[in-house]
Amino acid sequence: MAVMRGLVLLFLVFSVEYEAADVCSIGWTPFVVECFKFFPQAVDWVTAEKNCQSLDGNLASVRRPQQNDFLLSLVPVNTRVWIGGHDGEIENQWLWSDGTRYIYTNWCNTQPDNFKGSEHCLEISYTDNRCWNDEACSTTLGYICARRPS
């Protein structure tokens, strides 16, 4: 019985993933139940979030290691990008811009450090291990948007 439940669950996960693949707009890449797109144009974090919202999405949030790895696959090597994390409301209480719970992290060693008291937005860093860093929201970087399939 447990094997049957496992197979049914596996089928449901894959069917949802294929459903997303069928309805992501051209240029957007499916992953599980969302569509993602990397934008190389360098803008500040607030502008990146507004640009994603204008496309019916938000900056990408990350809920598990596999999703983090997927996002890295969208970004050229040695490229820093914005994703949707911020602690602009209460210092060191990180939130996702889409409102989802913050349950997974991939911070670089000694991060977040709020360097000079002005780092409140989350970037994927260009370091060897492509970990997360808090950065000044006014820094201009490319970004990754996420949205539900249309």
Language-model region placement:
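Extracellular, disulfide-bonded carbohydrate-recognition/adhesion ectodomains
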Residues: 1-150
